[in-house]
């Protein structure tokens, strides 16, 4: 279950289905990713073809990312079975 967000527009999209805080062309894929994150209790449950789940490295060790489009990723962490610190970013 998603417990916290870093990106206010992403949180608004998740809670109110208001896409003003994200790019319109990303809405469908981001919506799918958020639904999966809300149902997941471990990274293994998110290893879905086409979403390219991968752990981050270096200073971001412990964080995970899923591909939205181009360089855009939804990043997040697990805290036990909960998903926290959900963000939408271009970290490349």
Predicted regions and their residues:
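Enriched for short, Lys/Arg-rich terminal
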Residues: 57, 65-92
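Arg/Lys-rich, positively charged N-terminal/basic patches that mediate binding to nucleic acids
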Residues: 1-33
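A short, surface-exposed loop/turn module that caps and links secondary-structure elements
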Residues: 41-64
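Glycine-rich, flexible loop/turn motifs
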Residues: 1, 18, 42, 49-52, ...
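Conserved phosphate-interacting/catalytic interface
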Residues: 37
């Amino acid at each position: 279950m998603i417990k916290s967000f870093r990106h206010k527009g992403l949180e608004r999209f998740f809670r109110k289905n208001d896409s003003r805080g994200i790019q319109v062309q990303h809405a469908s894929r981001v919506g799918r990713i958020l639904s999966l994150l809300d149902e997941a209790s471990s990274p293994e449950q998110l290893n879905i073809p086409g979403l390219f789940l991968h752990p981050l490295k270096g200073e971001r060790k412990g964080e995970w990312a899923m591909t939205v489009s181009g360089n855009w990723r939804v990043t997040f962490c697990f805290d036990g079975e909960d998903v926290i610190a959900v963000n939408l970013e271009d970290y490349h």
